[in-house]
């Protein structure tokens, strides 16, 4: 995700429109109009809208899961289609961040060299291994959830993962590089934005199970949220210290790993309850 855009002056539109549309343009394959200005205002609006992208992914993934369950499609096939769709829809952007950061962490190199590894377009063995592990966790966990006819838990997973990503751009964090894509994003998310989205996620984690008449699973959805946020905070602390800053790739790393953990917690929790 890093190094793909540079600061450009321009005019801004209404935040409530510009933020989500630009997020869709930057982070998905949808050809929607985006902001003409490339600055930290735009970056902040995009990061504040990242959980909205999670909602879009969740709704589409949930629709695929529901249709597959209704039609009797094998759970592993449906789970694979959902994960592949998400990766294609987001241009593998976050998977790329997972690979780049994993390679840098696995190198045990000094911060300056680690940042060079992140910027290197080539992917090493550690990065490929991390991607494989994450994808396998996604598919196996979703298979278990679909076997239990809990398609709506698949829907919630990317919402939680995208929410966790915005912690990695909190105003207390600094970018690795003062220019480029990461500098537009890192340090732009305010605490009140995180709190607002946390309230939305809590409503989803409580309201959806109740709407599906599965109130006994609220504990699991809340636990998935808490575990994912905890993982994100631990990762942010380590990454910020390890690389002496954050960038777009670290955001993708946090997002992908938090989503994988959420899916795993959901699947294990449902298995225990069952």
Swiss-Prot record:
Keyword match Zinc: no
Keyword Isomerase on entry: no
Molecular function, one GO term: adenosylcobinamide-GDP ribazoletransferase activity
Matching InterPro entries: CobS
UniProt cofactor(s): Mg(2+)
Broadest EC class assigned to this enzyme: transferase
Keywords attached to this entry: Cell membrane, Cobalamin biosynthesis, Magnesium, Membrane, Transferase, Transmembrane, Transmembrane helix
Catalysed reactions, as listed in the record: alpha-ribazole + adenosylcob(III)inamide-GDP = adenosylcob(III)alamin + GMP + H(+); alpha-ribazole 5'-phosphate + adenosylcob(III)inamide-GDP = adenosylcob(III)alamin 5'-phosphate + GMP + H(+)
The EC number(s) this enzyme carries: 2.7.8.26
Disulfide bond sites: none
Pathway terms, separated by semicolons: Cofactor biosynthesis; adenosylcobalamin biosynthesis; adenosylcobalamin from cob(II)yrinate a,c-diamide: step 7/7
Membrane-traversing stretches: 46-66, 69-89, 117-137, 151-173, 192-212, 216-236, 253-273
Compartment(s) of residence: Cell membrane
GO cellular component, one term: plasma membrane
A biological process from GO: cobalamin biosynthetic process
Entry membrane topology: Multi-pass membrane protein
Chief localisation class: membrane
Job of this protein: Joins adenosylcobinamide-GDP and alpha-ribazole to generate adenosylcobalamin (Ado-cobalamin). Also synthesizes adenosylcobalamin 5'-phosphate from adenosylcobinamide-GDP and alpha-ribazole 5'-phosphate.
Family: Belongs to the CobS family.
Protein name, per record: Adenosylcobinamide-GDP ribazoletransferase
Species, as recorded: Corynebacterium diphtheriae (strain ATCC 700971 / NCTC 13129 / Biotype gravis)
């Amino acid at each position: 995700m890093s190094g793909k855009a540079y600061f450009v002056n321009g005019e801004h539109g209404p935040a409530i429109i510009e933020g989500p549309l630009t997020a869709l343009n930057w982070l998905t394959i949808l050809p929607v109009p985006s902001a003409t200005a490339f600055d930290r205002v735009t970056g902040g609006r995009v990061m504040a809208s990242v959980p909205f992208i999670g909602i879009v992914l969740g709704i589409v993934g949930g629709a695929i899961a529901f249709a597959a369950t209704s039609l009797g499609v094998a759970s592993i096939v449906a789970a694979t289609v959902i994960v592949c769709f998400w990766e294609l829809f987001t241009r593998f952007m976050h998977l790329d961040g997972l690979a780049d950061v994993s390679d840098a962490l696995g190198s045990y190199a000094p911060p300056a060299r680690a940042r060079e590894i992140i910027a290197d377009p080539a992917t090493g063995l550690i990065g490929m291994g991390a991607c494989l592990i994450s994808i396998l966790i996604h598919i196996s966990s979703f298979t278990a959830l679909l076997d239990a006819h809990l398609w709506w838990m698949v829907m919630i997973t990317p919402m939680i993962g995208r929410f966790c990503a915005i912690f990695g751009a909190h105003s207390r964090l600094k970018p690795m590089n003062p220019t480029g894509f990461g500098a537009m994003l890192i340090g732009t998310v305010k605490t009140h934005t995180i709190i607002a989205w946390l309230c939305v996620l809590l409503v989803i984690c409580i309201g959806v199970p109740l709407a599906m008449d599965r109130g006994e699973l609220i504990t699991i959805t809340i636990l998935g949220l808490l575990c994912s946020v905890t993982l994100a905070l631990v990762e942010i602390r380590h990454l910020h210290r390890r690389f002496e800053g954050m960038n777009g790739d670290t955001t993708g790393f946090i997002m992908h790993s938090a989503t994988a953990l959420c899916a795993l917690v959901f699947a294990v929790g449902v298995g225990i309850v069952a």
